[in-house]
Amino acid sequence: MSDPQPAPSAPRPGRAVLLAAFEGWNDAGGAATAAIEHLQEVWGAVEVARLDPEEYHDFQVNRPQVTLGEDGRRTIEWPTTTVWTATLPTSGRTVLLVRGIEPSMRWRSYCRELLRHADEHDVETVVTLGALLADVPHTRPIPLTATSESVGLQAVLDVEPTAYEGPTGIVGVLQHAAAEHGCASVSLWAAVPHYVGQPPSPKATLAILSRVEDLLSEPVPLGDLPEDAVAWQTGVDELAAEDPEIAEYVRQLEEAKDTAELPEASGEAIAREFERYLRRRDDGRNG
């Protein structure tokens, strides 16, 4: 691993960024990996590498899948990690997208291999995406936490220092490895209501993508995702209404959430939303 280099103060135009998400412990509701899949589609990403699953996975934990083609031939699909690359339409920046399953073993070697691919594409900033189950109501905006081990990024991008202590997943290990490697590193975490933690969770995916858009200063086409998020919330509303105990629990979560928040929206949040609106408007005109 290379010697640590001074981290830049912010992702600079023209310098590559790696965004990564992993199925498993770090991916409540499938929200983080769904965000990577969405970016892969809207940015027209091209596959550039697959990691050998033999090195990192216990196939009794993550079993391969057998599929049948139209000609009846059997194919085995192995659990693996895939790397794609894309060029952002507005800034021209190169982005690497990483999607995989949290490995069963050799996490340090796994991170080193991902960072070798990052070096090949001149990646300066590594952004890990995650989602966790939390005591939050589905009727309120999805809480999103952004943390960084890179001091220069904390003030520039309005992210918090990394303060968590306790068990971690591959997201935390990769974030730390990236910082040790000399990359700026940021971790984005969405809080998914624990009582509806099964995939999909489009409202949480939408929250993650909005923060990615802010981070890269690049409009992200959302397609049907906003409508999917509304439909998801409506569906949960209907389910909660059928069970008085769940409905009361949701009301308690709403009261706790509303009490904890400031009575007025923060200036930073308003500014971010306005900047996002301008980027999408300009992108629509240029398109």
Residue ranges and their predicted role:
Residues 135-219:
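Catalytic cores of processing enzymes, dominated by hydrolases/peptidases
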Residues 22-26, 97-107, 157-165, 195-199:
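Flexible, glycine/proline-enriched loop segments at strand-loop-helix junctions
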Residues 1-100:
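N-terminal short beta-loop-beta anion/metal-coordinating cradle
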Residues 196-287:
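A conserved C-terminal secondary-structure "cap"
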Residues 27-34, 105, 109, 165, ...:
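Conserved active-site and cofactor/substrate-binding residues in soluble primary-metabolism enzymes
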Residues 93, 100-152, 174:
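Internal, conserved structured core segments that host functional sites
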